[in-house]
């Protein structure tokens, strides 16, 4: 599945389930839908992978009222899942929105984990940003377990989202101006 941009109104959990089911050959994978329900264009700052990869590059921008479709998977022949962070810059507001996911290889030791945050300035994803999102440190909100909704305001934006709890995970996130 190529990463794509679709109208935000067309994003559904079924769309994400179809994407994740289309990733073959691995048991740990994720499809993420990110709705930009603001009046701003979001500029991609990159993707950081702690483990795993994506078969496609992430979209350069997400226009107002559009949704990003992104997928990632564990790397072949490794005992690790897919764990990473992608970030988009909200130029008109000089803020960055980060989305972090973790779909572990070993559910005896770990569980799915995710987070979203809006921060001041232009902040590309890297190991420090990812670790702060994963651990709820460095001023980042505490991460969420699957099946727990995020519904809060950060830096003038309303964030809403959820993650499913299995090795074929989905995350659906909405960003709105507060």
From Swiss-Prot:
Family designation: Belongs to the actinoporin family. Plant subfamily.
Role played: Actinoporin-related protein having hemolytic activity in vitro. Binds probably a phosphocholine derivative with the unique amido or hydroxyl groups found in sphingomyelin. Involved in drought tolerance.
GO cellular component: pore complex
Entry's free-text remark on domains: The Trp-rich region is important for the binding to lipid membrane.
GO MF annotation list: channel activity
Pfam families: Anemone_cytotox
Sites where the protein binds phosphocholine: 51, 83, 102, 104, 134
Induction data: Strongly up-regulated by abscisic acid, osmotic stress and drought, up-regulated by wounding, jasmonic acid or salicylic acid and not induced by salt, cold or auxins.
Region spans: Trp-rich region: 101-117
Gene3D superfamilies with a match to the protein in the record: Cytolysin/lectin
UniProt keyword annotations, A-Z: Cytolysis, Hemolysis, Stress response
PANTHER family named among the record's database cross-references: BRYOPORIN (PTHR40388:SF1)
Record's protein name: Bryoporin
Activity regulation information from UniProt: Inhibited by sphingomyelin.
Family matches, as InterPro entries: Actinoporin_PFT (IPR050677), Anemon_actinoporin-like (IPR009104), Cytolysin/lectin (IPR015926)
Domain of life: Eukaryota
GO biological process: cytolysis in another organism; monoatomic cation transport; pore complex assembly
Signal peptide per UniProt: none
């Amino acid at each position: 599945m190529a990463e794509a941009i679709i109208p935000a109104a067309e994003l559904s959990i079924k769309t994400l389930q179809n994407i994740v089911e289309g990733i073959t050959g691995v048991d740990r994978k994720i499809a993420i839908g990110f709705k930009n329900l603001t009046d701003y264009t979001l500029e991609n700052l990159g993707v950081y992978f702690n483990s795993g990869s994506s078969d496609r590059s992430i979209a350069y921008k997400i226009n107002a009222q559009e949704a990003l479709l992104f997928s990632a998977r564990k790397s072949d022949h490794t005992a690790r899942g897919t764990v990473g962070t992608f970030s988009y810059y909200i130029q008109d507001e000089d803020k960055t929105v980060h989305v972090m996911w973790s779909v572990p290889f070993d559910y005896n030791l770990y569980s799915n984990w995710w987070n979203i945050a809006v921060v001041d300035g232009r902040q590309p994803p890297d190991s420090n940003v990812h670790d702060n999102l994963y651990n709820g440190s460095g001023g980042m909100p505490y991460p969420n377990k699957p099946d727990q909704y995020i519904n809060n305001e950060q830096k003038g934006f309303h964030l809403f989202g959820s993650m499913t709890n299995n090795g074929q995970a989905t995350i659906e996130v909405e960003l709105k101006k507060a």
